[in-house]
Amino acid sequence: FVMLDLDIGMQDWLTAPFAWDDAHRMDRGKVMTAAELEAGRDFGRYLDVDGDGIPFRTYPGTHPTKGSFFTRGTSKDRYARYTEEGPAYVDNMQRLLRKFETAKARVPAPVITKAVKPTKSAVVWFGSTSAAMAESLAALELDGIHLDQMRIRAFPFADAVAEFVAAHEHVFVVEQNRDAQM
């Protein structure tokens, strides 16, 4: 297997046909409607109303005068108004920390596979390295090298990622980034 993102992205790859259920409705999260805006519901693009760090949003064009916003960088308040005030910056950073904690419990958990024999060594990978890892792990098994395995599927990392790493003396991280992205 050639382990190149470029190869994956530029070549035609065969897959099993995708199945789609036309009755399925996507959960789009906290989206404020035109009716809610018209009724005067408080909309702040960075306003955390329930403590999970994830604010409501609107779709472009939802309402002709309400629900739109413009922002730049991190110098903004809960209502996307420009500010250089320290407390507003701290408030936004604390909201982002809450958002990350919320997301850790909602994103797909890592896939953890125990080695066929007890080991204190492990390997961690993610993304397009998966096919190469399957091939490599099979070859290592034939050579008598057994590794616990974890395929990370999302960021921010679930608590299980830190627990997995802490449980091993040696952890090999396989990725395709010169500067150790993971």
What are the residue ranges of the model-derived segments?
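Flexible, low-complexity linker and terminal segments
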Residues: 1-182
